[in-house]
């Protein structure tokens, strides 16, 4: 079992340390998303170390499809495969099965679906998801869950929560078996359960109570940031937070904007991930301490300033807005790389500043100063 140490609190906000076999994670933390064991935009693991990334997130579904989890197992696991010596979290594949896969059919055993790449029929259930993640040898494995569309009818959401709980029990049992095998690469692989229930607070609370009884290594809130208003997301967090174990990390999946993250930390969340910093960067949409910047706007065509004068990332230390904008306009790979590096640097710096504010007992002031500013347009 991993150890989560709660160092300080301010209101519901938490400052902690999460000790794993691949190193200690300082929380709150943002996990950089490398879907296929790489971040799009030409960003290497060397870059990730330089910008302060603590945890990398990779995608079980995509790695199972290509290059195959058995190949990664034969290469010594995901850490050796892409030369990363810090924690890696792999999602269960559930979200992709329910959002990308074609012709899916859900049963109590799992999900039959067609690959979005070649149409090949695939079956994935709790045991298969755990086996794939064990082959990947990630630090943290996510339980296999049903990702229900939002909005969903109450009755369906309730039945789905019950099925997801039964799947979680099977995940826990299968992980215990896999971690005991002599051929398993990471015998200390951790398991996080996922809270579901759409935006129905009674379902969310009941589900969190039930999964908390299983004494897992961490607890995620899933099925949010899928189109519902931000206030509904915050309401769900507030509803389930009292029932999430205090001595375990809380992870809000797929979130989000800097403002979303600040709001969620304020409500007691420790872990975050999102493709937004890299995806937005590839289109010239950048995050700064002054607010959001669209680098492709005409006003930046002759701007000699860096993306942000208060930023220490490689792009801001060396290049102007005008130059990076030019690179994006001519589809030069360097432009996308510099923008991705900037956004990832900003997200990791945001988390470092949040931790510093919690350490110093001034998070409330930090929150008030930046919660609206980060959403403004520069």
Predicted regions and their residues:
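Conserved, mostly hydrophobic/aromatic
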Residues: 23, 56, 91, 133, ...
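Glycine-rich phosphate/ribose-binding loops and adjacent secondary-structure elements
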Residues: 162-165, 174, 178, 186, ...
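Non-catalytic, usually N-terminal nucleic-acid engagement modules in DNA/RNA processing proteins
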Residues: 1-185, 298-301
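C-terminal extensions of enzymes
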Residues: 1-17, 25-34, 41-42, 145-151, ...
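A non-catalytic, amphipathic alpha-helix used as a structural packing/dimerization or gating element
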Residues: 128, 132, 159-170, 206, ...
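Surface-exposed helix-capping loop/turn segments at secondary-structure junctions
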Residues: 174-184, 248, 354-366
């Amino acid at each position: 079992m991993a150890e989560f140490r709660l160092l300080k609190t301010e209101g519901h906000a938490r400052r902690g340390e999460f000790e794993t076999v691949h190193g200690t994670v300082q929380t709150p933390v943002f996990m950089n998303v490398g879907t296929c064991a790489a971040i799009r935009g030409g960003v290497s693991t060397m870059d990730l170390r330089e910008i302060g990334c603590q945890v990398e997130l990779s995608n079980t579904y995509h790695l199972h499809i290509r290059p195959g989890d058995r190949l990664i197992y034969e290469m010594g696991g995901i850490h050796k495969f892409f030369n990363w010596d810090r924690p890696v979290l792999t999602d269960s594949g559930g979200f992709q099965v329910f959002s990308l896969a074609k012709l899916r059919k859900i049963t109590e055993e799992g999900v039959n679906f067609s690959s979005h790449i070649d149409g090949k029929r695939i079956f994935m259930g709790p045991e298969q998801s755990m086996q794939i993640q064990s082959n990947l040898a990630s630090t943290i494995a996510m339980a296999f869950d049903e990702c229900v569309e939002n909005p969903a009818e109450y009755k369906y959401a309730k039945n789905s929560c019950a099925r997801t709980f039964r799947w979680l029990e099977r995940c826990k049992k299968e992980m215990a078996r896999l971690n005991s095998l002599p051929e398993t690469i990471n015998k200390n692989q951790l398991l996080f359960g996922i809270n579901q229930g759409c935006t129905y607070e009674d379902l969310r609370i009941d589900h969190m109570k039930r999964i908390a009884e299983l004494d897992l290594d961490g607890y995620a809130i899933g099925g949010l940031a899928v189109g519902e208003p931000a206030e509904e997301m915050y309401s769900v967090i507030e509803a389930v937070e009292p029932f999430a174990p205090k001595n375990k990390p809380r992870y809000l999946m797929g979130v989000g904007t800097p403002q979303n993250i600040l709001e969620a930390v304020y409500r007691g969340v420790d872990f975050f991930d999102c493709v937004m910093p890299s995806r937005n960067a590839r289109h010239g949409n950048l995050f700064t301490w002054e607010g959001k910047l669209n680098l492709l706007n005409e006003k930046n065509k002759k701007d000699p300033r860096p993306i942000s004068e208060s930023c220490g990332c490689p792009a801001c230390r060396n290049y102007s807005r005008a130059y990076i904008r030019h690179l994006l306009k001519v589809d030069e790979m360097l432009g996308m790389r510099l923008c991705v590096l900037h956004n990832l640097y900003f997200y990791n710096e945001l988390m470092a500043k949040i931790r510093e504010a919690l350490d110093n007992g001034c998070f409330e002031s930090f929150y008030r100063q930046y919660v609206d500013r980060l959403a403004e347009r520069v």
